[in-house]
Amino acid sequence: MSSIRELESRVGEEVGISPWLEVSQERIDTFARAVEDFQWIHVDPQRARASPFGGTIAHGFLTLSLLSRLSEMTFSFSDRRMGVNYGLNRVRFTAPVPSGSRVRARFTLAKYEPLEGQGVQVTWNAVVEIEGVDKPALVAEWIGRHYYA
């Protein structure tokens, strides 16, 4: 899909599935430093082996923040000057993301709302999946604004 305007006819449809993205321990550690959240379940592999998770896991907010990257890997809109996050609804962290696992996102378009000629507001039902795991890591309603080039 090359145009943000093409989305208007796709409301209610799954519009894209991202490629897989690795959630490495390095990525988790970098996120921990950025947000100053050093809880051992995220950054201490030795101690985390004895946890209910059997190893370190990604922060829930790291998984949530990956939506931006996963969407960039999925969509390329030639008529978009820029996009901004507008908000989130109904976010749930439904399964832990183990260090070293791979995730991808499925994007279903829930709403498409024009912004008075300057762009559109879209609401995605986003589901982040973990490779080889039936239960999703995250489900969220993600609202973004996209401004025309």
Language model regions located:
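HotDog/MaoC-like acyl-thioester-processing domains
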Residues: M1-R10, P96-A149
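A generic structural signal for short beta-strands and their flanking turns/coil linkers
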Residues: I17-P19, R27, D37, R80-N89, ...
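Residue-level detector of alpha-helical segments with a strong bias toward transmembrane helices
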Residues: E22-V23, Q46, L64, L70, ...
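Hydrophobic beta-strand-centered segment that forms part of the acyl-chain substrate-binding groove
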Residues: S51-G55, S65-R106, A110
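Hydrophobic (often cysteine-bearing) scaffold residues that line and stabilize catalytic clefts
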Residues: H59, T63
